[in-house]
């Protein structure tokens, strides 16, 4: 097994371990949001031997060996030997986990998520169940989970398949393929129900049960927003469908003309159709283009005609998305929120204010 690796550390403290052998394949795990990161991914296989340059870029040589128990599970489930790995040590947060790309030469076999956090293991089990349910509904272009379990030394392991190749593309603009995937979710998993019966409503209930996690002013504005949403839905039945909840370029790729979507660990069964598109648009604006809340709002204004083709009231839909994403992150991270998550929540709250003003105008 190859032991010679390159350790990559970015300015946010995120760490990747890349094998020097078949590095180009290993780098398929690395999904940078910045132009600098994308250039690094392109040229690293040819430049990593330049020691002075690597030092300036925050890289160093290390030796790395996969945990033998995890290695055994992977080889057994994928029915392969001499597999290779690249490793991402995770985004610093309450749900930090290690993600491993499994490959052999130029052939990517799948991915493995690892944690010692029992709460995260519950999320792994949810994702396995959710993927199985999506398959039963006829949703394709998603992974399968051949294994979700625990090693003897207490590591929780989640395996998933992939169709990714070296020719796969990551599209950073919301396009027809992304909308077609969301349309498929609506058609194949859509169901009529009362708002108060939906997963979407349960997320709001979870926030209300943890209202102490918000400042007084934030709590007041969230209460106003949830009242607006309650009034919008009323007592009639509405169509809800499956929701990815982290629908971003980093959780999908295109290959052979098809879009493949993964990382459904926060997936839910009953949300407003197409709501995922707001997460794609908002998060790429924040992370890739570093736009302010006002700039993101102006971009949404420019998309209003397009959004009206998918939503009866696009501004209400955007408010629903913003309230939901704030609620999920506040409840998920609790009192352990990092400064980066606090910054995100502040941006979403500012956007929520702008959207609520827009709704009053209309």
List each model region and its residues.
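Juxta-kinase regulatory segment immediately upstream of eukaryotic protein kinase catalytic domains
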Residues: 1-88
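ATP-binding glycine-rich loop module of kinase domains
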Residues: 96-125
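Active-site acidic catalytic loop and adjacent metal/ATP-binding pocket
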Residues: 97-102, 231-275
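Conserved kinase catalytic-core helix
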Residues: 127-142, 163-204, 222-236, 245-250
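Short beta-strand micro-motifs within the conserved protein kinase catalytic domain, predominantly
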Residues: 144-154
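Conserved short submotifs of the Hanks-type protein kinase catalytic core
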Residues: 154-165
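Active-site activation/catalytic loop segments of kinase-like enzymes and analogous catalytic loops
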Residues: 275-309, 322-337
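ATP/Mg2+ or Mg2+-diphosphate-binding catalytic cores
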Residues: 328-362
């Amino acid at each position: 097994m190859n032991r010679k690796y390159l350790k990559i550390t970015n300015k946010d403290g995120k760490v990747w371990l890349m094998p020097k052998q078949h590095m180009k394949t290993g780098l398929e795990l690395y999904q940078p949001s910045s132009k600098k990161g994308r250039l690094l991914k392109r040229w690293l296989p040819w430049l990593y031997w330049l020691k002075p340059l690597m030092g300036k870029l925050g890289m160093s040589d290390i030796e790395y060996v996969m945990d033998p128990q995890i290695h055994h599970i992977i080889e057994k489930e994928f029915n392969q030997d001499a597999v290779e790995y690249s490793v991402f040590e995770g985004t610093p947060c309450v749900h930090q986990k290690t993600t491993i790309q499994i490959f052999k030469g130029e052939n990517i076999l799948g991915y493995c998520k690892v944690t010692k956090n029992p709460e995260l293991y519950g999320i792994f089990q949810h994702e396995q169940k959710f993927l199985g349910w999506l398959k039963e509904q006829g949703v394709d272009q998603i992974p399968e989970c051949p294994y979700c379990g625990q090693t003897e030394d207490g590591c929780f392991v989640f395996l998933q398949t992939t169709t990714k190749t070296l020719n796969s593309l990551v599209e950073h603009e919301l396009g027809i393929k992304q909308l077609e995937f969301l349309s498929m979710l609506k058609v194949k998993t859509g169901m009529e129900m009362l708002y108060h019966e939906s997963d979407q409503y349960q997320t709001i209930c979870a926030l209300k049960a943890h209202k102490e996690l918000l400042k007084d002013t934030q709590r007041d504005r969230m209460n106003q927003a949830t009242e607006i949403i309650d009034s919008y839905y009323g007592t009639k039945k509405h169509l809800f469908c499956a929701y990815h909840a982290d629908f971003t370029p980093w959780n999908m790729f295109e290959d052979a003309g098809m879009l493949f979507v993964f990382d459904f660990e926060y997936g839910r069964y009953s949300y407003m159709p197409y709501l995922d598109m707001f997460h794609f648009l908002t998060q790429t604006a924040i992370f890739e283009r570093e736009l302010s809340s006002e700039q993101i709002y102006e971009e949404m204004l420019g998309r209003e005609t397009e959004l009206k083709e998918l939503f009866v009231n696009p501004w209400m839909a955007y408010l629903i998305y913003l309230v939901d994403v704030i609620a999920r992150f506040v409840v998920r991270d609790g009192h352990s929120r990092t400064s980066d998550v606090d910054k995100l929540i502040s941006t979403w709250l500012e956007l929520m204010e702008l959207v609520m003003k827009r709704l009053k105008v209309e």
